[in-house]
């Protein structure tokens, strides 16, 4: 009888101990999941903060009317610098987020690595954009405090080759970063050929026609060509342009980089086969480069400035669009990776302490 009672007591003790251990295990599991969910909340909050900061810093900078008549060339540099600064802040915040993710408790290691990989990829793209924007900002700054569309003395001036080269390279790098991120770059519609600089009233005469000085009417024609130019086609012309030293344009010159190098007395047929897009592209190249200025009659001074401002805003607008799409594409990839973070009952510490001889079953759940 006594042995039976002892056996019953022992059985009850074992049952109670088992229940206690189970309750403790369930408590620890619940605490682990709570810690995991707390980590997810912090990660999510950090990601939302990045979106907020980016929108706040870039919201005012991005747009299709970055400059206006009377603004200096350096204003374009300020525009690029503001966007670059915003991307730098975003890149720094992504690094902080990566550190937070590394500290996440009870998270499946492979899903954590997927997020960190997405962040690293985005950071590389942002760095490429920042470098390109810095290059463009520095070039515009070096162009000085000359007004956009400067034609004060009615004598054309060639854009410096080094400046034009830097602009072309900067635009190419931005497009390269976008394409790397899966953003589609359009070619646009370049438009029909426009009249060459045979007459002083032709649009291209402001480059330095065969009489060296444009006369009244050329400015209005140039403004008209720029107004109908497709921004995507302008970007394509800039991307494929080749910089040149200051020259007197020969007949048939139509490359945007070469047109921007016109310094005086162009051939009567200079600009043959040029179109609205190429006209706008060399206007932009001249406005961001040191030395670039136009020939215009006094009565056309305002029209030439308006044409230059319009060309600059069209290019800035499409570049801003490309940058925004590129940034959004990379942040969306990070967002999807964050959504894929899974819970794991096995922490890195647990795995280390268990030793190599004992295989570990990694239990994961969404």
Swiss-Prot record:
Signal peptide interval: 1-18
GO cellular component, as recorded: cell outer membrane
Residues lipid-modified (N-palmitoyl cysteine): 19
Keyword field contains Nuclease: no
InterPro entries documented for this protein: Borrelia_lipo
Pfam families according to UniProt: Lipoprotein_2
Keyword Signal: yes
Lipidated positions per record (S-diacylglycerol cysteine): 19
PROSITE patterns associated with the record: PROKAR_LIPOPROTEIN
UniProt-annotated location(s): Cell outer membrane
Topology with respect to the bilayer: Lipid-anchor
Highest taxon listed in the record's lineage: Bacteria
Miscellaneous note of the record: Genes for both Vlp and Vsp families are on (usually) unnamed linear plasmids in B.hermsii HS1.
Described function: The Vlp and Vsp proteins are antigenically distinct proteins, only one vlp or vsp gene is transcriptionally active at any one time. Switching between these genes is a mechanism of host immune response evasion.
Family membership: Belongs to the variable large protein (Vlp) family. Beta subfamily.
Protein name stated in the entry: Variable large protein 10
Protein species of origin: Borrelia hermsii
Taxonomy of the source species: Bacteria, Pseudomonadati, Spirochaetota, Spirochaetia, Spirochaetales
